[in-house]
A protein has these predicted regions:
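Short, structured "edge-of-domain" segments at secondary-structure transitions
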Residues: 1-260
């Protein structure tokens, strides 16, 4: 949250069973917490999106390497950030930048706005950064993902609501200066906390599937992992999240209880 970053070898990360204490990956400062991790190689370009709606781009090898117990380096020493800025989301650029025309990039903001652009719009970013998205007062970018037209978008809120809609029904914006359009109808004091992209696989609307259909559904099944602030989680089949129109109120994804 306070803008520190580092890179390390995947060899230092081991698979563990659920429910364990885990292993130290980074030492955090007071009231700081880890918000995002990526798996990249040293030649991958990484996009950094700021709370002010700007985007920066650097190669992964320029991020200082650190041990599991190190605190990392401040992003202010790596990117030309101003004092009031912080990074809200990071995203790896496809390794083959020539393929950027095949993909789109989706933005989601805390106030429920979404926007889709061609990834080509972000292939050339100078060292001083570029405008990625205009934001309303008190709004901020909470997630940025790469997607294709045959995938769906899922937005999740602080109060446990979710909405799923087709990416192809969200038009591609031609510029980077738009504020986007409504992705979900938020309740008072609620806000978007997560943006996810999943494959567009659905059950038949009449609910009747043949044996072959069911085998194919099982093979294509994906799962949504919902984790609460206090560390409780649940795994749900993506078939349980029906596809609706963008801008609706969504469904309950996880109960927002005092325990969670």
């Amino acid at each position: 949250l306070q803008g520190y970053i580092k890179r390390g070898s995947l060899k230092t990360v081991k698979i563990q069973k659920r429910g364990g204490k885990g292993k130290t990956g980074i030492t955090t400062r007071n009231e700081d917490s880890v918000v995002q991790t990526l798996s990249v190689n040293t030649h991958t370009s990484v996009l950094f999106f700021s709370t002010e709606g700007l985007v920066y781009k650097i190669k992964a090898w320029k991020i200082p390497e650190g041990s599991a117990s190190s605190k990392g380096k401040s992003l202010f020493n790596i990117l030309p950030l101003k004092n009031h800025q912080s990074i809200s989301s990071i995203m790896p650029f496809p390794e083959s930048e020539e393929d950027s025309s095949k993909y789109q990039i989706v933005f989601a903001t805390s106030k429920g706005k979404v926007r889709k652009n061609s990834l080509e719009d972000f292939s050339s970013i100078n060292t001083s950064g570029k405008i990625a998205m205009k934001l309303d007062t008190n709004d901020r970018i909470i997630g940025v993902k790469i997607c294709k037209d045959d995938q769906d978008i899922i937005l999740s809120t602080k109060f446990g609501k979710c909405i799923r809609f087709e990416s192809k029904k969200l038009r591609i914006f031609k510029g980077r200066s738009s504020k986007g359009i409504k992705g979900i109808e938020l309740a008072p004091n609620d806000e978007i906390v997560s943006l996810s992209i999943i494959d567009n696989n659905k059950m038949k609307k009449n609910g009747k599937n043949t044996k072959d259909d069911k085998s194919e559904l099982a093979a294509k099944q994906k799962f949504i992992l919902s984790i609460s602030e206090n560390g409780f989680g649940k795994k749900t089949s993506h078939y349980d999240y029906r596809t609706t129109n963008r801008g609706g109120k969504g469904i309950i994804g996880i109960i927002n209880s005092p325990r969670n």
